[in-house]
């Protein structure tokens, strides 16, 4: 059976780069897309801003402390969506097997491509060149035989990078990866893995599937496969994502009071940042909890206004927590997500975002 040829394309500082492209006075300067207000969140940061530690999803006030001369520019989501459509038109010159992950990121299956180009790396090179020439933006691309490795490859030489992970080099490459680089390993999961003496791909590969499933649930089986370079997920052009969410599994169970006062505010802030980055608009909030015995419960509420900021999300999340009949039980997992997208978003699959396996 022939190996698949998968490309992951990730635009470089997409929103911020568009602002620098359209506003010459911003070029070479640290800029952030967002509002410089007490309640503001950075939706995107230029590479100049990132050198000061400014990151997307960061509160604007914190960003200004890190970089006092940071320039804020308003979010122009209509422009970002239009540019995203232009980028996708370039992708479709080569294949219709395009799976959008967000406005600025997509997988392409070029195993059978329209021009009949034999090498995927040549297609990636052409796509990058056409994006630069036609849109005056840069993209990073990763090439490999599955989605997991293609995504890692696109991050490897950012910005404006191109990197290939060949099947013959995959095992050695994965073995040296820090555990944080694995898709699905966020801060909390990385801490739990380090507590189990798993800090890189080689140590992850040394663990059997039962061990990983016991400690990480269903995701443990995914980690087991990733450590072996196995990822059979197809590129799905019709995939429609209808929510934005984040969740965290805790190394030590948290009390109800800790959840209300400490954990939910952090999740609400993270969710607000993801909503800002994605441009997703929805008005249904879902709270997900998992108890130490792995019993899971959810509560949701739909409100008239669109949920975009921590200040709107957190009170509603706390209300849902109060309504949850949990008694004095502790929690091993908490999660928040916004769904029920507006009709205008259902018209374009690249206008939606779901960050999978983040924790």
From Swiss-Prot:
Kindly identify the residues recorded as the active site: 105
UniProt cofactor(s) = Mg(2+)
Can the keyword Lipid metabolism be found in this entry's annotation?
no
One GO BP: DNA-templated DNA replication
Q: InterPro entries from the entry?
A: DNA/RNA_pol_sf (IPR043502), DNA_pol_Y-fam_lit_finger_sf (IPR036775), DNA_pol_Y-fam_little_finger (IPR017961), DNA_polymerase-Y (IPR050116), DNApol_IV (IPR022880), Rev_trsase/Diguanyl_cyclase (IPR043128), UmuC (IPR001126)
Q: Where does Mg(2+) bind?
A: 10, 104
Task: Please give the GO cellular component terms listed in this UniProt entry.
Answer: cytosol
Subcellular locations according to the entry: Cytoplasm
Function noted in UniProt: Poorly processive, error-prone DNA polymerase involved in untargeted mutagenesis. Copies undamaged DNA at stalled replication forks, which arise in vivo from mismatched or misaligned primer ends. These misaligned primers can be extended by PolIV. Exhibits no 3'-5' exonuclease (proofreading) activity. May be involved in translesional synthesis, in conjunction with the beta clamp from PolIII.
Q: Which HAMAP family match?
A: DNApol_IV
Assembly and oligomerization: Monomer.
Name of this protein = DNA polymerase IV
* The organism of origin for this protein: Akkermansia muciniphila (strain ATCC BAA-835 / DSM 22959 / JCM 33894 / BCRC 81048 / CCUG 64013 / CIP 107961 / Muc)
Organism lineage string: Bacteria, Pseudomonadati, Verrucomicrobiota, Verrucomicrobiia, Verrucomicrobiales
Query: What is the gene called?
Result: dinB
């Amino acid at each position: 059976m022939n190996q698949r040829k998968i490309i992951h394309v990730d635009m470089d500082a997409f929103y911020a780069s568009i602002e620098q492209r359209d506003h010459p006075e911003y070029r070479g300067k640290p800029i952030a897309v967002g509002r410089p207000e007490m309640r503001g969140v950075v939706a995107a940061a230029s590479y100049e801003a990132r050198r000061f530690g400014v990151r997307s999803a960061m509160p604007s006030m914190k960003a200004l402390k890190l970089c006092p001369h940071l320039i804020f520019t308003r979010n122009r989501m209509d422009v970002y969506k239009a540019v995203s459509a232009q980028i996708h038109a370039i992708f479709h010159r080569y294949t219709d097997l395009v799976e959008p992950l967000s406005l600025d990121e997509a997988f392409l299956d070029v195993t059978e491509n329209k021009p009949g180009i034999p090498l995927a790396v040549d297609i990636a090179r052409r796509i990058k060149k056409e994006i630069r020439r036609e849109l005056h933006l840069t993209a990073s691309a990763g090439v490999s035989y599955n989605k997991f490795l293609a995504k890692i490859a696109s991050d490897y030489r950012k910005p404006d990078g191109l990197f290939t992970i060949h099947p013959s080099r995959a095992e050695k490459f994965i073995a040296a990866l820090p555990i944080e680089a694995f898709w699905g390993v966020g801060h909390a999961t990385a801490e739990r893995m380090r507590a189990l003496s798993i800090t890189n791909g080689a140590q992850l590969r040394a663990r059997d599937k039962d061990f990983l499933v016991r400690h990480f649930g269903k995701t443990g089986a995914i980690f087991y496969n990733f450590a072996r370079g196995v990822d059979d997920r197809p590129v799905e052009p019709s995939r429609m994502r209808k929510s934005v969410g984040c969740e965290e599994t805790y190394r030590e169970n948290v009390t109800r009071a800790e959840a209300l006062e400490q954990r939910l505010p952090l999740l609400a802030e993270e969710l607000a940042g993801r909503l800002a980055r994605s441009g997703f608009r929805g008005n249904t909030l879902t709270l997900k909890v998992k108890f130490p015995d792995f019993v899971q419960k959810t509560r949701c509420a739909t409100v008239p206004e669109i949920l975009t900021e921590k200040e709107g999300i957190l009170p509603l999340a706390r209300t849902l927590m109060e309504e949850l009949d949990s008694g004095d039980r502790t929690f091993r997992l908490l999660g928040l997500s916004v769904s029920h997208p507006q009709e205008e978003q259902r018209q374009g699959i690249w206008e939606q975002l779901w960050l999978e396996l983040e924790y």
